[in-house]
Amino acid sequence: MTVRIEDKSAERVVGVRVVGPYPQTIPQGCQRLMAWQQQHQVPLGKWLVLYWDDPAEVAPERLRADVVFTVADDFVLPTSGSEGFALQTLPAGQYAIYNVRVSDGDFERVWGDFYQRELPASGYQPVEGVSYEHYLNDCEADGYFDLDIYQTVKKG
């Protein structure tokens, strides 16, 4: 598992904000977003979770994340039944990408490996911007999580 660096284009996403301990709130956000997606028959893009807080610095009950999926650039949020849902644009830029499999539910270890070992070894450092997970498989059906962790970066 090594870090690769890519220049990414901006991407539009739609989703829902969750606040609280990640292990509880992110699955709830996934269920809510999936129900909304099915109700509105929105084509399902890449499934992502955007993280806005560091669990080492923010109390669990205040942790913020956005459970989202990518949509077309011209997507318009339905006016009915979309309360609590929002459109965002993930910024274009340089990203470090770390591909991992989580089979034991220990996301904290994987993120720690990324920030404490793999990212520093790459010669890049995080910058203020976006960090998120891109889910690459059907996690519930497979029983594990294949994902890419993305972080905006600059050359160290």
Curated annotation (Swiss-Prot):
GO molecular function, one term: DNA topoisomerase type II (double strand cut, ATP-hydrolyzing) inhibitor activity
Protein origin, superkingdom: Bacteria
Location in or out of the cell: Cytoplasm
GO CC, one annotated term: cytoplasm
Main location: cytoplasm
Pfam families: GyrI-like (PF06445)
Keywords: Cytoplasm, Stress response
This protein's record includes keyword Cytoplasm: yes
Family: Belongs to the DNA gyrase inhibitor family.
Subunit structure of this chain's protein: Interacts with DNA gyrase.
Function of the protein: Inhibits the supercoiling activity of DNA gyrase. Acts by inhibiting DNA gyrase at an early step, prior to (or at the step of) binding of DNA by the gyrase. It protects cells against toxins that target DNA gyrase, by inhibiting activity of these toxins and reducing the formation of lethal double-strand breaks in the cell.
Name of the protein in its database record: DNA gyrase inhibitor
